[in-house]
UniProtKB/Swiss-Prot annotation:
Keywords: Acetylation, Endoplasmic reticulum, Lipid droplet, Lipid metabolism, NADP, Oxidoreductase, Phosphoprotein, Signal. This is 17-beta-hydroxysteroid dehydrogenase 13. The keyword Endoplasmic reticulum applies. It catalyses: 17beta-estradiol + NAD(+) = estrone + NADH + H(+); all-trans-retinol + NAD(+) = all-trans-retinal + NADH + H(+); all-trans-retinal + NAD(+) + H2O = all-trans-retinoate + NADH + 2 H(+). Its EC number is 1.1.1.-, 1.1.1.62, 1.1.1.105. InterPro entries: NAD(P)-bd_dom_sf, SDR_fam. It comes from Rattus norvegicus. Belongs to the short-chain dehydrogenases/reductases (SDR) family. Residues 1-19 form the signal peptide. GO terms for molecular function: all-trans-retinol dehydrogenase (NAD+) activity; estradiol 17-beta-dehydrogenase [NAD(P)+] activity; oxidoreductase activity, acting on the CH-OH group of donors, NAD or NADP as acceptor; steroid dehydrogenase activity. Substrate binds at residue 172. NAD(+) binds at residues 40-67, 189. The modification Phosphoserine is found at residues 33, 69.
Amino acid sequence: MNLILELLLLVGIIIYSYLESLVKFFIPQRRKSVAGQTVLITGAGHGIGRLTAYEFAKQKSRLVLWDISKHGVEETAAKCRKLGAVVHVFVVDCSNRAEIYKSVDQVKKEVGDIEIVVNNAGAIYPADLLSTKDEEITKTFEVNILGHFWIIKALLPSMLRRNSGHIVTVASVCGHRVIPYLIPYCSSKFAAVGFHRALTAELDTLGKTGIKTSCLCPVFVNTGFTKNPSTRLWPVLEPDEVARSLIDGILTNKKMIFVPSYINISLIVEMFFPERVLKAINRIQNIQFEAIVGHRTKRK
């Protein structure tokens, strides 16, 4: 096919894609069933991970819950069991590659293949760069992105054999735009968004269209990891709201899940703004939270 025909085909694909998106906006999408499917959720002892586990329990999924906190993950499991779910609990440090591989092997032996994985475990240390300890930077990347690599490397082979599965990357709006005093966190979330996009492209190239991918990108979430967050333009979300949006995105095979959904439009528009305008938006937005600046805790 010559270049002109390929370009015409590209135009056709663009028009079709926009029309399809328009139709999906007005017509509710069909939701797939995840009843009976085995779902692995990391960071399930708190916040978004815990509430996501509840949502999957309501969908009658079989749950494998990971968290570094035994108390937290056991609390989540107890509620999920009350909702009628079969639950398997593992205490796992998602910054430890050897522990991840060992735990995946244990899951395969005791539970079987994982059909849906939600890489949710996260770490955040609000501080200016010079006040951030080296080990905090390392931990942020180990949990927020390297752990994703080790988990997916361990789980992907069985998904490839079946040409079936769903890989969910929990990132953040901070994976698309930056916030001061969160340099390691923003950097790790940019990496997580890149991981999702690159993995999606690779699976498509391999022809493994049965393996779905989703990436969750919420704004500030009131999980307690960032103290006293506030902002003028973006809402501070509750974990249950984010979990409901996440499960809806998974059930409709949505690639990128922004919460709230209009953030996607905001990010697209901002791409066309000069730096001076973006700085003005940041001032108006007035994002604040407790952070260590100059080795002292301040509200920034």
